[in-house]
Amino acid sequence: MKFSIIALALAVAFVCVAESRSEEEGYDVSEEIQAEELEEAERGGIDRKLMEVVNNLRKVQGREDSEEAGRGGINRKLMEMVNNLRKVQGREDSEEAGRGGINRKLMEMVNNLRKVQGREDSEEAGRGGINRKLMEMVNNLRKVQGREDSEEAGRGGINRKLMEMVNNLRKVQGREDTEEARGLKDKFKSMGEKLKQYIQTWKAKFG
């Protein structure tokens, strides 16, 4: 209680001294107070602006340490890429995995050709596959050429396709001109002749 009374008395004395001093020196204490308030207001405006900038940085960067955040994001992206490569290639050594995958794919293609052409029942499979291919070619020729010039186009297209098939068989079987290949080629030629006769008969009937 005594302390509060003493503090109040000191405050009253300070105000009285300040007023008497302002009267003697010719300036108003209120002006000094206004200047201090203006300075505080300016500082408050600057503080608000700084807080806005800080908040914007936090929103954009997602945290206060933007450099670390950037590095962390890049590292995460790199790890995702590495993991994706590992998943696709099935192992860390991508070069070996690539070569192994290509070799497996080539072996699958060779095995599929063997099964179709096939060293299991190559004659029947060959005849069935060739007949289907020839019928598809005939149907395509009819649709594309409109039945106007089927004989010449049929001979040229069929001969090219037959030669491609013969060449593919030669490459897969590892020889260029064996008795089997010659016999198969003769079969292809005879089938081509039959197809030619069929086309001529069809043209004679339907024009």
UniProtKB/Swiss-Prot annotation:
Name of one Pfam family that matches: Latarcin
Annotated motif Inverted processing quadruplet motif 2, positions: 91-94
Subcellular location, principal: secreted
Motif (Inverted processing quadruplet motif 3): 119-122
InterPro entries listed in its UniProt record: Latarcin_precursor
Motif Processing quadruplet motif 5 mapped to chain: 152-155
Residues annotated with Glutamine amide modification: 61, 89, 117, 145, 173
Keyword tags: Amidation, Antibiotic, Antimicrobial, Fungicide, Repeat, Secreted, Signal, Toxin
Domain of life: Eukaryota
Subcellular location(s) of the protein: Secreted
UniProt motif (Processing quadruplet motif 3) ranges: 96-99
Segments carrying motif Inverted processing quadruplet motif 5: 175-178
Signal peptide: 1-22
Chain location of the short sequence motif Processing quadruplet motif 2 per the record: 68-71
A GO-annotated cellular component: extracellular region
GO terms, molecular function: toxin activity
Motif Processing quadruplet motif 4, residue range(s) on this chain: 124-127
Motif (Processing quadruplet motif 1): 40-43
The UniProt record lists the keyword Signal: yes
Function in brief: M-zodatoxin-Lt4a: Has antimicrobial activity against Gram-positive bacteria (A.globiformis VKM Ac-1112 (MIC=0.3 uM), and B.subtilis VKM B-501 (MIC=1.1 uM)), Gram-negative bacteria (E.coli DH5-alpha (MIC=4.5 uM), E.coli MH1 (MIC=3.2 uM), and P.aeruginosa PAO1 (MIC>35 uM)), and yeasts (P.pastoris GS115 (MIC=36 uM), and S.cerevisiae Y190 (MIC=18 uM)). Does not have hemolytic activity against rabbit erythrocytes. Causes paralysis, but is not lethal when injected into insect (M.domestica) larvae.
Recorded family membership: Belongs to the cationic peptide 03 (latarcin) family. 04 subfamily.
UniProt protein name: M-zodatoxin-Lt4a
Organism: Lachesana tarabaevi
